[in-house]
From Swiss-Prot:
Native organism: Arabidopsis thaliana (Mouse-ear cress)
Location in the cell: Vacuole; Endoplasmic reticulum
Protein name: MD-2-related lipid-recognition protein 3
Post-translational modification: Neddylated.
UniProt KW keywords: Endoplasmic reticulum, Plant defense, Signal, Ubl conjugation, Vacuole
InterPro entries for the chain: ML_dom (IPR003172)
Gene name of the encoded protein: ML3
Signal peptide: 1-24
Alphabetized Pfam families for the sequence: E1_DerP2_DerF2 (PF02221)
């Protein structure tokens, strides 16, 4: 029985459309010389923007592996950069966005996930980068010290198809 050439081509074409969506993770890089005192980031997944057109939000899921204990008092900052301008979008307490509790920390040698919800979506532009940083407040420093930081671009929203 001869196999039609149409079926394999159709399968290839369909897979080209769906495989990138199934992958979900986006490219990221560590910020400047700071980066990974607390461990490594393994992937970042950004959900599509939701909410009213004038105030859409996204959810950022950051997955990582802790090489040191990450204290419960750690702060998580989400910011965006457009050229030289940096704007703070949201600040979270670590235990509000992870599996730790206020008495415990994320222990060294464990994997963790940060779920950063209701982050303002500032729109798509090739120059805009989002940044997620873990910061530790100390008595000696006025501003919290960056212990882990990654930059990434939020992908352009996929076009919506509407049939009538």
């Amino acid at each position: 029985m001869a196999m039609s050439h149409v079926q394999p081509m159709l399968l290839l074409l369909v897979s080209l459309f769906f495989l990138p969506a199934l992958r979900g993770a986006i490219d990221f890089e560590y910020c400047a010389k700071n980066g990974n005192d607390y461990g490594t980031v393994t992937s970042i997944v950004v959900s599509p923007s939701v909410g009213p057109h004038e105030n859409p939000t996204i959810t950022i899921n950051l997955f990582g592996s802790a090489s040191k204990n990450i204290p419960a008092g750690t702060l998580v900052y989400v910011a965006f950069r457009d050229g030289e301008f940096t704007g703070l979008l949201k600040t979270y307490n670590l235990c509000d966005v992870s599996a730790c509790n206020n008495e415990a920390e994320i222990e060294a040698g464990t994997n963790f996930e940060l779920t950063l919800s209701d982050v303002l979506y500032v729109g798509y532009d090739e120059e805009i980068k989002y940044s997620v940083s873990l910061r530790r407040k100390t008595l000696e420093e006025e501003d919290p010290i960056i212990k882990m930081c990654v930059d990434f671009k939020v992908p352009a929203p996929a076009p919506a198809f509407v049939s009538i």
